[in-house]
Regions:
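Beta-barrel outer-membrane channel/assembly domains of diderm bacteria
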Residues: 2-4, 8-10, 18-27, 31-169, ...
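Outer-membrane beta-barrel biogenesis signature
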Residues: 29-65, 167-225, 271-278, 387-392, ...
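Residue-level detector of the transmembrane beta-barrel scaffold of outer-membrane proteins
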Residues: 64-66, 110-114, 158-160, 245-247, ...
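Outer-membrane beta-barrel and related beta-rich outer-membrane complex signature
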Residues: 79, 125-127, 171-180, 297-299, ...
Length: 517
């Protein structure tokens, strides 16, 4: 056993063994002379290496490599075009990272870090009818997801500093007791980057300038249910008390938020001993809030965002512009372990009081509407003997329905030139759409509302021995937009008129797998 030897003695022992084995392998020779100066140079080099390693008495850092691969074959139909892509499934993207921990020697406190990146190629959330590989992602071939250091205690919780999750991040998915959110969750990560298509326009010229995400998003992200993202800041995550955990944080520049999560098991009739693995019910829930006053959003910095909002002057400009976006969201899930039956639900609200969105509607003079969305899913997750599936792991079948209302994301990036005046989404703060923004709508309009619905069916098969999941999902989505105008070609008297804009449905089917390491 060499476990108790120093680096120097282990290398010397290995060298000696190599010399001895080599002497036998090459036939009878004189006994190897291991004395004298034969190993002096080697010892000197080892001493140099030891000087660059953690010395005895310092706290050693253990490093863990982790990650996952998640790929799918995507078949899609936008109402006219049908096609096939191979994608990186952004419901839970492929990624890898490093975690390091070290004991501080002070109670149970440990220090550590986390660095995590994801490849951006073929990101399913960024593909569309014209782009099947996302080769020119602005983040480059790799996107940094996490980069922070922390101090953690089982008793007092964990403090983080750096690029990390905001408290509300994933609040609508990470308390799901089935843990099926990596196959499909409430957002539309497989097609949100696709362009809307007008009914009756079946060629490339029939595609709108707006994407699905432009009418189904929070005011500060391209998602409707995962509004808060990962930001640069400081955060606190509590230990778990009887299933409850709390988190709060403050992030550049400026955003703050808090969240409460719960995950536990229970028995309807109690037992007097608290939660137990023998309890027949699993339950999870979470609720979170965030307030974002970052004038420049994700580009850092702050302060006034000056300059006009093209193509219109005041009052739709950025003079003394102030950001004010608020999000709150939550979820709940329950599973009956003996039968495998489960139910999941999520909700999300987002509103903006940005100074250039208040009473800024181009034709109506109204403020931006509140975005709201809800999702319900239900199914069964258990071992099935059919075709020997129970030998692999749990099998899950489920379906769901969701609705997202007024997800217009009509806010502006702010910041300094050239960002001032640019829109965060595809809809400006005054919600003005020029003629033919939506093909077939030949007059300028104001978009006052939207509705996106989705129903879905899904299958997931765990392969426990390989730490893998295989899955297949079908989704059907519909979209409606509310448009008004006072354009004289439609309203000679200048009265507010509704404008129709029928849009094609979107169907997709994807099947693939993910493996964790």
């Amino acid at each position: 056993m060499l476990g108790g030897l120093s680096l120097r003695h282990r290398v010397l022992a290995a060298t000696a063994a190599t010399v001895l084995i080599g002497s036998f392998a090459h036939g009878p020779v004189k006994a190897a002379d291991l004395g004298g100066d034969c190993c002096a140079d080697l010892e000197e080099r080892i001493a140099e290496l030891e000087a660059t390693t953690v010395r005895k008495g310092n706290k050693k850092v253990s490093v863990t490599l982790y990650g996952q691969e998640n790929h799918a074959a995507l078949f899609w139909d936008d109402g006219a075009e049908k096609n096939f892509y191979v994608v990186d499934n952004n419901y839970e993207s492929s990624r890898f990272g490093f975690k390091g921990t070290a004991k501080t020697g002070f109670g149970d406190w440990v220090g550590g870090y986390r660095l995590e990146v994801e490849p951006t190629g073929a990101n399913s959330a960024k593909l569309n009818q014209f782009d099947d590989d996302n080769a020119n992602d602005s983040a480059g071939p790799l996107n940094v997801r996490h980069s922070y250091m922390y101090l953690s205690s089982k008793t007092y919780g964990e403090g983080r500093m750096g690029l990390t999750a905001t408290p509300i991040y994933n609040i609508t998915k990470d308390t799901n007791v089935t843990e099926l959110e990596d196959t499909m969750h409430s957002d539309n990560r497989m097609m949100q980057g696709f362009f809307l298509r007008s009914k009756g326009f079946d060629n490339a010229e029939g595609l709108s300038k707006l994407k699905w995400q432009n009418i189904s998003s929070c005011y500060d992200s391209n998602n409707a249910f995962v509004c808060g993202t990962r930001k640069n800041g400081v955060a606190y995550w509590s230990p778990t008390w009887a299933g409850f955990s709390f988190s709060t944080g403050y992030f550049e520049d400026d955003e703050w938020g808090a969240a409460l999560r719960y995950k536990n098991s229970f028995s309807l009739w109690g037992g007097g001993s608290g939660a137990s693995e023998d309890d027949p019910w699993l339950v999870g829930a979470g609720i979170g809030y965030s307030k974002n006053t970052d004038e420049r959003y994700q580009t850092g910095g702050g302060g006034d965002a000056n300059g006009p909002n093209p193509p219109f002057p005041a009052p739709n400009n950025f003079r003394n512009f102030k950001r004010d976006v608020q999000d709150w969201a939550g979820s709940a899930s329950i599973k009956h372990k003996p039968t495998g039956l489960f139910l999941f639900s999520a909700f999300s609200f987002s509103e903006t009081n940005d100074t250039n969105t208040i009473h800024s509607g181009f034709y109506t003079g109204t403020s931006a509407p509140q975005m709201n969305g809800w999702d319900v899913q239900g199914g069964i997750q258990r071992d099935f003997d059919f075709l020997g599936l129970s030998k692999l792991g749990e099998t899950s079948f489920w379906g769901g329905y969701e609705q997202i209302n007024d997800g217009l994301a009509s806010v502006s990036l702010g910041g300094n030139f050239p960002d001032n005046g640019k829109n965060f989404g595809g809809i400006p703060a005054d919600r003005f759409l020029s003629a033919n923004t939506i093909i077939g709508v030949a007059v300028p309009t104001e978009i006052t509302g939207s509705e996106v619905t989705r129903w879905s069916l899904a299958f997931d098969q765990a392969v426990d021995s390989a730490n893998m999941h295989l899955y297949a999902v079908y989704q059907h989505l519909t979209a409606d937009v509310d448009l008004v105008t006072r354009d004289p070609t439609v309203s000679p008297t200048g009265k507010l008129k509704n404008v129709g804009a029928p849009l094609d449905d979107f169907d997709l089917f994807y099947t693939g797998g993910r493996i964790y390491f």
